[in-house]
C-alpha cells in the first residue's frame, strides 16, 4: 500500500513561500560578489536581485529575469551543445568579455516524471524528481547544489517559471554571498532549465538516456540544443500538441559524449507526451523524432527509451536497467490509484522513487528536488533534498 503524506497546500497564483514555520523571504539577499562581464544597469540590478528563500542557507534562490535573453537569436545561433551555448551567452548576453576564463558550462539530468489527473478535482498534475550527483573532481565527494527558480516574462511570449541546477555553471551552495563567485553567468539562467511551466499550464522536463547523443542534420532546419528547445517551448507553446509541432521545425543536437535525453511534457487540458529521438542502430546517433502518447503506460518516464523503435536495444525498455526500478514503482503506484492521484499522493509517489545519499553513485543517483506541478492552477510545490515536510510554493510570477 502506498504511503500517503501531508497534503500539499496550493497557494495563490503569483508567489513563492515556504510552508514551515519560517517567515517567507521576499526581499533580495544582499551580496558583495562581483559581476565582471556586466555594465548595463538593468542587468546588474537583475543579477543582484536574487532572494535566498531560506534567508542565509544558500540552498534555494529565486529571481525574475527582467532583461531580453534574445531567444530569436539563440534559435538561429546554431547552438548544438554547451560550448556553443556558452559562446552565445558571452557574445549576446554579456556586456564585455571576461578577463579570465568563463566557468565550465555542463548539463545533465537523471530524473523521474509522471502526469495524471487530480482524483479530487478537475485539475491536472505533473510529478517530477530531478536526480543528479555532482562530485568534486577526481573524488566521490558529493558537492551540493543551489536550486534557482527563474521567472521570465518575454515580450510577446508566455510568462513562466523554471528551475535550474546552479552547479551546471559552477555555482555551489551559498555562491551568491561567498564574496568570490562572479555573478555574470546568471545571465545564462533562461537556457539552463531542467523543468518548468508557463502561464497556459504547459510544463516540460528533460530526462537522461544512455547511448550516443541525438544529432539531427537536416540542412533546411536550424539547430538547437536541449535547453534552448525547452526555453522555446515554455515561451511559445500553449499545449503539448503545439510543443510537438515546434520541435519538428528544428534539428535537435545533444552534446554529451555518451548520453542523450528525452522530454516529458503535459498540459492543463490533460494531454501528455514523451518525445524521444531514436535510431535502432545504437552505433549511430539518434536522429528520428518520435512523439509517444495515447495510453496510460506513457504517463511515467525515467531513464530508458520507451519507443518501440528502441525497445530491443541495450538502452530500450526491454533491456535497460537504468531507472527500471523507479519506473516500475511509478507504474505500479499510478495503477493502484487508477491513474489518478491527489497532490499528496503524487508527492508520495515521488518520495517512493527518490534517491538518497546511500543510493547509486552514478550521475543520476541523487534526488536534488521534487515537484508537484498543478497544471490547472499553474503552481509548483517543491521539496529539496528529500525534506518532505518542507515545501516551497511557486506561481508563474514572483511575489513582490
Kindly give the residue locations of the regions a language model identified.
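Bacterial N-terminal signal peptides that target proteins for export
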Residues: 1-5
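C-terminal motif of bacterial Sec signal peptides marking the signal peptidase cleavage site
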Residues: 13-17
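N-terminal mature-domain region immediately after signal-peptide cleavage
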Residues: 18-238, 252-253, 339-400
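A recognition module on extended beta-rich or small alphabeta surfaces enriched in W/G with H and D/E
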Residues: 155-167, 307-320
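Non-transmembrane alpha-helical segments in soluble domains
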Residues: 231-234, 244-247, 331
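Secretory/export targeting leaders with adjacent low-complexity proregions
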Residues: 245-255, 263
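Extended amphipathic alpha-helical segments with heptad-repeat/coiled-coil character used for oligomerization
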Residues: 257-311
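Long, charge-rich alpha-helical interaction segments
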Residues: 314-343
Amino acid at each position: 500500500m502506498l504511503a500517503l503524506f501531508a497534503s500539499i497546500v496550493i497557494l495563490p497564483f503569483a508567489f513563492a513561500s515556504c510552508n514551515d514555520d519560517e517567515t517567507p523571504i521576499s526581499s533580495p539577499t544582499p551580496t558583495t560578489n562581483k559581476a565582471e562581464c556586466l555594465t548595463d544597469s538593468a542587468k546588474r540590478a537583475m543579477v543582484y536581485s536574487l532572494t535566498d528563500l531560506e534567508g542565509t542557507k544558500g540552498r534555494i534562490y529565486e529571481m525574475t529575469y527582467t532583461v531580453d535573453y534574445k531567444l530569436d537569436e539563440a534559435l538561429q545561433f546554431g547552438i548544438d551543445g554547451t560550448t556553443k551555448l556558452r559562446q552565445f551567452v558571452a557574445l549576446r548576453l554579456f556586456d564585455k568579455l571576461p578577463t579570465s576564463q568563463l566557468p565550465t558550462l555542463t548539463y545533465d539530468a537523471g530524473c523521474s516524471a509522471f502526469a495524471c489527473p487530480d482524483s479530487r478535482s478537475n485539475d491536472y498534475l505533473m510529478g517530477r524528481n530531478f536526480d543528479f550527483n555532482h562530485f568534486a573532481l577526481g573524488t566521490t565527494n558529493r558537492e551540493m547544489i543551489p536550486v534557482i527558480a527563474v521567472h521570465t516574462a518575454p515580450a510577446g511570449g508566455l510568462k513562466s517559471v523554471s528551475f535550474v541546477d546552479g552547479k551546471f555553471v559552477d555555482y555551489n551552495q551559498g555562491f551568491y554571498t561567498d564574496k568570490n563567485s562572479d555573478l555574470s553567468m546568471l545571465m545564462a539562467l533562461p537556457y539552463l532549465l531542467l523543468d518548468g511551466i508557463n502561464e497556459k499550464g504547459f510544463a516540460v522536463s528533460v530526462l537522461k538516456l544512455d547511448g550516443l547523443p541525438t544529432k539531427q542534420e537536416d540542412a533546411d532546419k536550424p539547430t538547437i540544443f536541449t535547453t534552448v528547445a525547452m526555453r522555446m517551448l515554455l515561451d511559445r507553446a500553449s499545449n503539448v500538441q503545439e510543443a510537438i509541432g515546434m520541435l519538428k521545425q528544428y534539428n535537435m543536437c545533444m552534446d554529451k559524449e555518451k548520453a542523450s535525453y528525452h522530454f516529458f511534457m503535459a498540459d492543463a487540458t490533460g494531454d501528455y507526451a514523451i518525445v524521444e529521438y531514436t535510431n535502432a542502430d545504437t552505433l549511430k546517433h539518434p536522429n528520428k523524432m518520435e512523439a509517444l502518447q495515447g495510453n496510460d503506460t506513457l504517463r511515467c518516464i525515467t531513464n530508458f527509451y520507451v519507443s518501440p523503435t528502441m525497445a530491443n536495444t541495450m538502452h530500450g525498455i526491454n533491456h535497460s536497467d537504468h531507472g527500471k526500478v523507479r519506473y516500475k514503482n511509478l507504474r505500479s503506484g499510478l495503477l493502484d490509484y487508477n491513474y489518478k492521484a491527489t497532490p499528496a499522493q503524487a508527492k508520495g509517489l515521488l518520495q517512493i522513487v527518490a534517491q538518497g545519499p546511500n543510493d547509486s553513485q552514478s550521475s543520476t543517483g541523487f534526488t536534488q528536488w521534487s515537484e508537484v506541478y498543478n497544471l490547472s492552477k499553474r503552481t509548483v510545490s517543491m521539496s529539496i533534498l528529500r525534506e518532505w515536510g518542507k515545501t516551497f510554493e511557486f506561481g508563474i510570477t514572483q511575489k513582490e
